[in-house]
Amino acid sequence: MTDKVRIYDIAREMGRDSRDVLEVCEQLGIPFKTHSSTISPEQAELVRSKLGAPHIVKPPRPRPKPPSESLPPEPPAEAKVGERPQQKVPGTASAIVGIRRPAPAQQPAPVGEAKTAETLPAAKPSLSRPERVSPEKGSAGGAQLIGPPRRQVTPLVRSSEATQKPETVSQPATPPTPSESAAAKASGSEPSPVAKRPIVLSPPQRATSGTKPPAERPEPPQKAPEPSRPSPSEAPSPSHARVPQPAEEKAPSPPPAQRPRPQLVSAPVRPGTRSPATKEDSVSSGKAGEAPRPQRRMELVGPPTRPVAKPAPPEPDAASPLPERIPGERPSPVLVEAPVRPTPPKVKRKTEEEEDDELQALSRRAARVQAKRKRSRRRGEGDGDGLDLDPMTIISAVKQAELNALKPLARPTAKPPSYRPPAATAAPPARPRPAARLQQQPTSAEAGAADRASGTEPLPEEKVLLLDGSLTVQELAHRLRVAETEIIKTLFFKGVMVTINQVLDESLAESVAKELGYEIRRPKAEPEAKKTEMLDVEDIDHLVSRPPVVTIMGHVDHGKTTLLDAIRDTKVAQGEAGGITQRIGAYHVDVNFEGQKRRIVFLDTPGHQAFTAMRARGARVTDIAVLVVAADDGVQPQTLEAISHARAAQVPIIVAINKIDKPGSQPERIKQQLAEHGLLPEEWGGDTPMVEVSALTRRNLDALLEMILLVADVAELQANPNRPARGTVIEAHLDKARGPVATLLVQNGTLRVGDTLVAGAVLGRVKAMMDDRGQRLQEAGPSSAVQLLGLDEVPAAGDEFQVYTDEKEARRIAQERAEVLRQTRLQQALLSRRVSLGSVSAKAQEGQLKELNLIIKTDVQGSAEAIQTALRDLPQEEVQLRVLLAAPGEITETDVDLAAASDAIILGFNTTLAPGARQAADDKGVDVREYDIIYNLLDDLRAAMEGLLEPEEVEEPLGQAEVRLVIPIGRGAVAGSYVLSGKVQRNALVRVRRRGEVVYEGRLDSLKRFKDDVREVAAGFECGIGIDKFQSWQEGDIIEVYQMVTKRRTLASV
């Protein structure tokens, strides 16, 4: 393998990138795998000849590099050593300048040809190697390298540059050390390149160490006799250095020599004008090459920075055409940070409190100066004892330096913060704070500190607490603008132990707020059925008439669904469990009216009291409310609730008095009852249309439909079909075959297959749509009720949906809403374990409060909502209900696992069990109950809650006896008694009353009739009653006989 040559060795010898050599090998058909592959010497010669340079026999370690264009074949050896002395020799810097300018266009060949393009690709791989070689030898190599560069540079070198660089070269013995140390921090083995350019920066570094104030940059050069003069000029001359160094990268084609110089140049680049976003801008503006941070401090103070400006820098800036070529980023920050690091630790010993106090003192002092100046202007006094000065001038230089040091250290990406007078801004924001703390709301203590620092008194606030429900301790503290510990302490004195995240019920929060002097106000409750406006301003010019949406409302069993069946010629009511509607339905009906075919959309709502939310949802989206009242039953609670929903939604009401065909119906009585609740019939001079109908006999149905269309025409219902659809989710459920299915009511726009929509927090794409009769639709216009497939999850009934043209925006909105929903659920979970002063929390702490965990699975989302609403109405003083899961869909094995883990009961309402769920429930002992009527579900749930209640002992009276004769026996006495009522039993509990007062309570020990012991004596018989512990009988005493029995408690008795 010794006679073979590696591809990357050829690339290094030729000053080319390995990829160039690989391309040549590919062209010549030479097999290879990577740049580390070896080829024979004959193949190597072919490659070298193809690349256009003769082979120079050199071992790979020396890393021969062909110098610039006109050098003879020897330069590779000289190039190695030559890089080191370039710092010393006066002519090298000027020669480098000359080499750089031709370099970008040419690639120098190793022999002597004018090819400098090879240097550019080789610059990156050679950074580390030349740096190691250069520090060891500084002068010998320099003499050798001087010759070749001078020949090329002579036409391009300026006289000023030639004179300045000899001076800098003369210093390498001493100056290189600081520069090398600075560069060594950035790259451990890069001293030689750092020595070249830092030589230029070394005098400024001495100056920074010698003079603490950064503004006195010109002075340090004076300390050093020879180097100090060139150093200030060359402090801007980092730009000078930049020009030669890029040239040096290109002139020495071999990679090893080129990289150190770009890195050296990078150090001057930062002090120069290169980085606009860093604090080093001040150095680039013309000031000596000092560290940027001290300069920033002087800029903050203001006055000292002005004298520091120097006219010298423009010359080097003009001479630096190639600053962008400099790749070295690491050395530059090291050179800048080296002088800065020693200073901050001295000042940073102060704590944040001391910084606050100092800033506040300065702000107050500045405020006093401004106040005095204003008063002097008003009085016309012109004394200039510092009153005309800016508030910053009263700060001594020492204070300014301390204040500057208090500020956070400069970061390379951050802009230098401009100093503002402390009086103008609050003190806390000026201090560096952790980002996490800045995101939090300021505490009351911080707010007070800010007010004091700004010199302004906080305005007196009205101490009012808007209380809208249960709150956590943290939320209550924020609303009251007090510390959380204050709330916890107040509750502790009340005997309540809480943590910051615990939820306080409304009464407890109110008591805490009142104790802290706050007035309690409660927000005005908005009705559930408040209508949402779906039209936008842009729709006004494109409105067309739309069909009316009519909601059928009324009390249970008043014939709502039967009436709708009669209108639609269907038999929906016959298929309903228990003969009652338990879900909201949407239907279309086409009616011939005045020779035109008109469409009406009907929403059928449940009448049971548990389905309040469904009725409110129907009223919110409807245009007309049809109130069905049974003529034989009259106005009932849900009838009144429906009236309130319709009024809240501000929709017109049409009353349909149903069942007029039944005997005993009294339509006039119904009208009288409705008039008492504000619905006055039209024939009585009111504005409420009332139609007497019979659903079974189809009597007056046409009159009802005609009335609906007349009211709709008066309302002038309109929508814009030429826009993305908007509307409301009427109902939703999970179908095991089709997935999430939602019933949508399109209220504006047109919904099409393929649209992307967001319903509440659920994202989806319309895959298919069906109407109420199961026919597929491609689009649905305004006032259309459709079943939609394609949602990711089951949306909540009542959520509004909207179609978005941009899917990314829709996804973002859905994610934001989902996060809000998640927070709401967490709050609800906390509310289930709220703390109160009542008996509930006390019993819970004593372990007397029992919990019943439930998992509710229903056919549709609205049913789950209705069941949860009904559960909240049950008394929960001793048994609390915790709903772990309430969702539509079938009961799965996952639900069974959750129930087994949490000891919960699964309630299935109009749903089925998935395959395997029944077996899993039997194996794990989970109680799964299925219902199709909500009455039965609530009754069983109430019974289960009562079963968890501890049975109570109650007194059951047995009988009464009157003492007629006291019979003394031995030391005691026996009461000869007559049984007045009931019976008297031996060993029963007795209560002896004398003139209405109880004189003894105990147990009846002996009972005799004549001389025989008996177990009991019935009413109307005489007996002898003896009690061992009571002997003081008197005639006329009443003996009450009773027993204690355990009785099952009911929720009504709780």
Swiss-Prot record:
Q: Which NCBIfam families match?
A: IF-2, small_GTP
The record's subcellular locations are:
Cytoplasm
What PANTHER family has UniProt attached to this entry? TR-TYPE G DOMAIN-CONTAINING PROTEIN (PTHR43381:SF5), TRANSLATION INITIATION FACTOR IF-2-RELATED (PTHR43381)
Record's function text: One of the essential components for the initiation of protein synthesis. Protects formylmethionyl-tRNA from spontaneous hydrolysis and promotes its binding to the 30S ribosomal subunits. Also involved in the hydrolysis of GTP during the formation of the 70S ribosomal complex.
The molecular function terms of the Gene Ontology recorded here are: GTP binding; GTPase activity; translation initiation factor activity
Gene Ontology CC: cytosol
- Which residue ranges have biased composition labelled Pro residues? 65-76, 221-235, 304-316
**PROSITE patterns for the chain:** G_TR_2 (PS51722), IF2 (PS01176)
Sequence segments annotated as region (G4): 658-661
Q: Which domain of life is it from?
A: Bacteria
Tell whether Protein transport is among the UniProt keywords: no
Q: Could you tell me which species this protein originates from?
A: Synechococcus sp. (strain JA-2-3B'a(2-13)) (Cyanobacteria bacterium Yellowstone B-Prime)
* Region G5, annotated ranges: 694-696
Segment G3: which positions?
604-607
Q: Where is the composition biased (Basic residues)?
A: 365-378
- Protein name per the record: Translation initiation factor IF-2
Chain spans, region G1: 554-561
Query: Which HAMAP family does the entry mention?
Result: IF_2_B
- Region annotation G2: residue ranges? 579-583
What InterPro entries does its record include?
EF-G-like_DII, IF2_II, IF2_N, P-loop_NTPase, Small_GTP-bd, T_Tr_GTP-bd_dom, TF_IF2_bacterial-like, TIF_IF2
Q: Where is the composition biased (Low complexity)?
A: 179-193, 421-437
Residues binding GTP, per UniProt? 554-561, 604-608, 658-661
Xref: SUPFAM superfamilies: Initiation factor IF2/eIF5b, domain 3, P-loop containing nucleoside triphosphate hydrolases, Translation proteins
Annotated ranges, domain tr-type G: 545-718
Ranges where the record places region Disordered:
48-390, 409-458
- List S-S links within the chain: none
**Subcellular location, principal:** cytoplasm
